[in-house]
Curated annotation (Swiss-Prot):
Residue ranges annotated as Lumenal topological domain: 50-61, 123, 173-174, 220-238
Gene coding for it: Mmd
Residues that span the membrane, as ranges: 29-49, 62-82, 102-122, 124-144, 152-172, 175-195, 199-219
Any one Gene Ontology cellular component term annotated for this protein: lysosomal membrane
Membrane topology term: Multi-pass membrane protein
Descriptive protein name: Monocyte to macrophage differentiation factor
Tissue expression as described in the entry: Preferentially expressed in the brain.
Keywords: Endosome, Lysosome, Membrane, Receptor, Transmembrane, Transmembrane helix
Coarse class of the protein's main subcellular location: membrane
Gene Ontology molecular function terms on file: pore-forming activity; protein kinase activity
Family recorded in the similarity comment: Belongs to the ADIPOR family.
An individual GO BP term: positive regulation of neuron differentiation
Location of the protein in the cell: Late endosome membrane; Lysosome membrane
Species of provenance: Rattus norvegicus (Rat)
Length: 238
């Protein structure tokens, strides 16, 4: 109780079971800035992978991954700005909140695309290249039908989609980068604690954003280091 009273201005009460948490003004600002500052680095990083691509398939993969990465931060930032400054536009806010949830599914699929597209995989793993996008489409349909109704189910879908391709990727003969992949996944999982702690921990959602940013950076590093050329090769080809 003393903790809540001390940080009352930085945190509101928990959301109802089928409702959405209402952040304080401080939390709104933190939610916006923690992802807004990552938009430009995401764009630059995506462009770098595209420039380092050797062939058409690598370029397509870099484009898919880059679009997912940039979309995550852009859509999240726009939603939090609308939620903060234009909350009276209920329909607009609701639409952007749905987009914010949907883009997570496509970001997960895009994050695995480089590993599934650019590494030699077995027959089962090759099917995962397409199945993961079917899961993303299924998640999108779920958001349309049951947005904010079954929060635990939604979280289960995110975690299932995050772990299912990992089981296939770990079966690759070339295991370079798997430690970084696992490390990033662990960071995402730890961040989920804060994702579900609005109204319990001040700035919980903004802290979740920082976990997402850190995990995404670890995964980007692994993709850049093990699936695309090194900076030395890049400079040599300029």
């Amino acid at each position: 109780m003393q903790f809540r009273n001390r940080f009352q201005r930085f945190m509101n009460h928990r959301a109802p079971a089928n409702g959405r948490y209402k952040p304080t003004c401080y939390e709104h600002a933190a939610n916006c800035y923690t992802h807004a500052f990552l938009i430009v680095p995401a764009i630059v990083g995506s462009a770098l992978l595209h420039r380092l691509s050797d062939d058409c398939w690598e370029k397509i993969t870099a484009w898919i991954y880059g679009m997912g990465l940039c979309a995550l931060f852009i859509v999240s930032t726009v939603f939090h700005i609308v939620s903060w400054k234009k909350s009276h536009l209920r329909t607009v806010e609701h639409c952007f909140h749905m987009c914010d949830r949907m883009v997570i599914y496509f970001f997960i699929a895009a994050s695995y695309a480089p590993w599934l597209n650019l590494r030699e995989l077995g027959p089962l793993a090759s099917h995962m290249r397409w199945f993961i996008w079917l899961m993303a489409a299924g998640g999108t349909i779920y958001v349309f039908l049951y947005h904010e109704k079954y929060k635990v189910v939604e979280l289960f879908f995110y975690l299932t989609m995050g772990f299912s391709p990992a089981l296939v990727v770990t079966s690759m003969n070339n295991t370079d980068g798997l430690q970084e992949l696992a490390c990033g996944g662990l960071i995402y999982c730890l961040g989920v604690v804060f994702f579900k702690s609005d109204g319990i921990i001040p700035f919980a959602h903004a802290i979740w954003h920082l976990f997402v940013a850190t995990a995404a950076a670890v995964h980007y590093y692994a993709i850049w280091k093990y699936l695309y050329r090194s900076p030395t090769d890049f400079i040599r080809h300029l």
